[in-house]
Amino acid sequence: MIKDVIKKSEEKMNKTINSLNSELATMKAGRANPTMLDRIQVEYYGSMCPLNQVANVSSPEPRLLVITPWEKPMLKEIEKAILKSDLGINPNNDGTIIRLLVPELTEETRKNLVKNVKKVGEQAKVAIRSIRKDANDKVKNFKKEGTITEDEMKKGEDDIQKVTDKFVKEIDTIVAAKEKEIMSI
């Protein structure tokens, strides 16, 4: 019973880590990375689609992204979506492809990015702690129902805390690595 609760909690915590990694991948660190564009939605025949479903995105140079739409009329829509996004990069449309030159990050921009990284990391920690609380509540309910003893409840809570600590430490490591990546010139 308790093992199932811990296993489900670990699965949820892993999803939180995956979500953190995905979100941090979209944060530009002065290098062009196609994942920077993952959150951009483009209007495609009346409905919104992710950019990577209407175009090929490549990074031929460290600071350059090239977007090649599968249909030429999509150039304007892609350009419009990039301009509306929070990327802060101006697209260069040459009629067949769109080039995005990722600017060098200024010291101030780097510091703001690091603040955002810390904020996202803190949100992930809050999510992990929320999962821990839910797991502890389930274990306490088992005790109330009389299906486990007081000692089993305490051991279960300790095990849940160990799992939580492991994931919080992993978040700290991921955030520190991203900060280092952003601050390195």
From Swiss-Prot:
Keywords: Cytoplasm, Protein biosynthesis. It is found in: Cytoplasm. GO terms for cellular component: cytoplasm. It comes from the Bacteria. Transmembrane segments: none annotated. It holds the Pfam family RRF. GO terms for molecular function: ribosomal large subunit binding. SUPFAM superfamilies: Ribosome recycling factor, RRF. GO terms for biological process: translational termination. Gene3D superfamilies: 3.30.1360.40, Ribosome-recycling factor. InterPro entries: Ribosome_recyc_fac, Ribosome_recyc_fac_dom, RRF_sf. PANTHER family: MITOCHONDRIAL RIBOSOME RECYCLING FACTOR PSEUDO 1 (PTHR20982:SF3), RIBOSOME RECYCLING FACTOR (PTHR20982). NCBIfam families: frr (TIGR00496). Responsible for the release of ribosomes from messenger RNA at the termination of protein biosynthesis. May increase the efficiency of translation by recycling ribosomes from one round of translation to another. Belongs to the RRF family. This is Ribosome-recycling factor. It comes from Clostridium perfringens (strain 13 / Type A).
